[in-house]
Amino acid sequence: MTGWWASITLSSGDPMARPEAKATQMVDDAKVRVTRFDFAPGAETGWHTHGMDYVITPVTDCEMLLEEPGGATRRVTIPAGESYRRDAGVEHNVINDGDAPMSFVEVELK
């Protein structure tokens, strides 16, 4: 992946075992990069490390399985519209762990 993924470093060159989430860049300027992610059930982002602080706002209710370094996993459910913020440096793979499509908008702070 290239272009808007410039701030995200994929952790492995291995092909993903699951379908890939669809990423649609909405804004990319000097201050922010805004990307919408749409996941079919079971789809994933692939392992990556965030190069910038970011805010996530779910468009739908999101049932996520987060794969983390060292083999740890976390299941989280985030209601539509409930935003959260993370610092740069987060490494993970985000998977739609639900039975329905899920979507969120990511705002990266430059």
Which positions does each model-derived feature cover?
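Tryptophan (W) side chains
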Residues: 4-5
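A short glycine-rich, His/Asp/Glu-containing loop-to-beta-strand
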Residues: 19-47, 53-56, 107
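Short beta-strand His + acidic residue motifs that chelate non-heme Fe in jelly-roll/DSBH
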Residues: 45-47, 65-66, 91-98
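Glycine- and acidic-residue-biased ligand/ion/polar-headgroup-sensing regions
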Residues: 50-70
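Short acidic-glycine-tyrosine-enriched beta hairpin
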Residues: 72-88
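Ligand-binding loop in jelly-roll beta-barrel domains
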Residues: 89-110
